[in-house]
C-alpha cells in the first residue's frame, strides 16, 4: 500500500507518457518536497504545471483546469496535493466545458461518458482517501455539490509518507480529522457492508493511535500510519 519515490520514478520511466499535465497546490507542492523531486523526474518530459489557487474546489477554477488540459492534450494527468487538488483532477478528467455545466452539477445529472486520459494521484495530506474514491466535490455559487461515477477513480495512486510531514499543523489536523470522520461515517452508514466496515475499523484504529503524535512530532512512522488510515477510510 505504501510507496516510495522510486515507485513513481519507475512508473514514469516504464511508461510511454510524453506529455504530462501536473496539477498541484502551490504551497504544498513546494513544502512537501514534491517540487524538487518532480522537476528532476519530469525533466525530459513535456509538462505543463497548473497551480490551484482556490482553497476549495470551485466551478470557475475547474473550468480553467479543463480548458488547460484540453489545450495541452496530455497523455497523463498527475495530481499532487490535498483533497481539493485530487477532486479537481478527477472531475476535469471526465467533464467537458458546456453552457449548462453548472445546472448539470446542481441537478446531479452530468452525463458521464469516458475519461479524457490517464490519471495518477499523489496525496500530500492524509485525509479522506480521495485517491481511492469514485466521488468528488465541487462548489457552485458557494454551495457544495458532489459528482459520483466509477470514471472518477484514478488509474494509479502513490502514497508517499515523506510528502505529508511538512504540511502546516492546521492542514494535518483538519485532514486527519477528515480521515477519522470518514471512517466513523462508514461504520454507521446504512450503505455500509462487511468490507467497508472492516476497512473503516482498521482505519479508525490506526488513526486514533497516530493522529496526535503526527501533529506533535511528525516522523516517517506516524506519517506512514496516517497515510494508511486515510487510504482505508476512503
Identify the meaning behind each predicted range.
Residues 37, 66, 85-99, 132-135:
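Short Gly/Thr/Asp-enriched flexible loops that form oxyanion-binding sites at enzyme active sites
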Residues 1-76:
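ATP/NTP phosphate-donor binding region
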Residues 62-74, 162, 219-234:
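Short, hydrophobic/aliphatic alpha-helical segments
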Residues 74-90, 124-130:
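Glycine/serine-rich anion-binding loops at beta->alpha junctions
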Residues 98-194:
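A glycine/threonine-rich phosphate-anchoring loop and its flanking beta-alpha core
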Residues 19-21, 48, 75-78, 117-123, ...:
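Structural motif
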Amino acid at each position: 500500500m505504501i510507496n516510495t519515490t522510486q515507485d513513481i520514478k519507475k512508473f514514469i520511466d516504464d511508461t510511454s507518457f510524453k506529455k504530462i499535465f501536473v496539477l498541484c497546490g502551490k504551497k504544498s507542492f513546494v513544502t512537501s518536497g514534491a517540487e524538487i523531486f518532480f522537476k528532476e523526474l519530469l525533466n525530459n518530459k513535456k509538462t505543463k504545471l497548473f497551480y490551484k489557487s482556490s482553497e476549495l474546489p470551485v466551478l470557475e477554477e475547474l473550468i480553467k483546469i479543463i480548458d488547460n488540459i484540453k489545450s495541452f492534450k496530455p497523455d497523463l494527468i498527475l495530481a499532487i496535493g490535498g483533497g481539493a487538488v485530487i477532486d479537481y483532477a478527477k472531475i476535469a478528467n471526465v467533464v467537458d466545458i458546456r453552457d449548462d455545466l453548472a445546472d448539470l452539477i446542481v441537478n446531479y445529472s452530468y452525463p458521464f461518458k469516458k475519461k479524457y486520459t490517464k490519471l495518477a494521484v499523489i496525496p500530500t495530506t492524509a485525509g479522506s482517501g480521495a485517491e481511492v474514491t469514485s466521488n468528488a466535490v465541487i462548489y457552485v455559487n458557494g454551495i457544495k455539490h458532489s459528482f459520483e461515477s466509477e470514471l472518477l477513480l484514478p488509474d494509479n495512486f502513490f502514497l508517499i509518507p515523506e510528502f505529508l510531514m511538512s504540511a502546516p499543523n492546521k492542514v494535518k489536523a483538519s485532514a486527519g480529522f477528515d480521515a477519522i470522520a470518514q471512517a466513523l461515517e462508514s461504520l454507521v452508514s446504512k450503505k455500509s457492508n462487511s468490507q467497508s466496515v472492516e476497512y473503516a475499523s482498521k482505519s479508525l484504529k490506526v488513526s486514533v493511535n497516530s493522529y496526535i503524535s503526527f501533529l506533535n512530532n511528525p516522523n516517517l512512522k506516524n506519517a506512514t500510519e496516517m497515510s494508511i488510515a486515510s487510504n482505508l477510510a476512503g
